[in-house]
Amino acid sequence: YRLKEGRIIRGLRGKARITINLIEYNIYPQTIATFLPGSIIELLEFTPDCDFQMIAADKDFLPLLRGDQLFESHTRQNLVTQVTDTEWKLSDAYFTLIWDTVQEVPFRREVVQHLLAALLHNIKYIRTEEANDTSRRFSHQEEIFWRFIALVNEFSKNERTVGFYADKL
């Protein structure tokens, strides 16, 4: 399934095995996953007790950022992140506050936009800290692989030759 909107998912219970843009991931409890607009998602399997919370937002919903930057900071290997207890509690507070605000009448668009932007910035901060952990650095081969996957996801509708991707790498 190709997503039209970006999504933020919190794994609450159980386990799910998914592919995001050809890469397989496992989502467990206390996991946060972000999916870019245009991502290709496939649910491979899930346990009977699997439960998620999800926020979906059109790329044009956050005018304070350029539409193509909505989930920009969550590309490549940082799509799925296991978080600490403190980070998990904070993400729960964001989800609850966003949900409660969405239910208000009249709809408070700007408030929801800024809360969502704050949540995305917090996820970016968590992942930046994770990326700075030198024990998690990628090999040169892994970096090339991730660049290749990103190129396929960006150009696969129009480009289908190996030569095109080889030139880009």
Where are these regions (language model features)?
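N-terminal regulatory/effector-sensing and dimerization cores
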Residues: 1-74, 104-105, 109
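Short acidic/polar alpha-helix capping motifs at helix-coil junctions
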Residues: 3-8, 41, 65, 114-116, ...
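Short, flexible active-site loop motifs that bind/organize anionic cofactors or intermediates
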Residues: 20, 52, 78, 102, ...
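Repeat-unit-sized solenoid/scaffold elements
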Residues: 44-52, 56, 119-136
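Amphipathic alpha-helical segments enriched in hydrophobic/aromatic residues interleaved with Lys/Arg
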Residues: 73-118, 122-127, 150
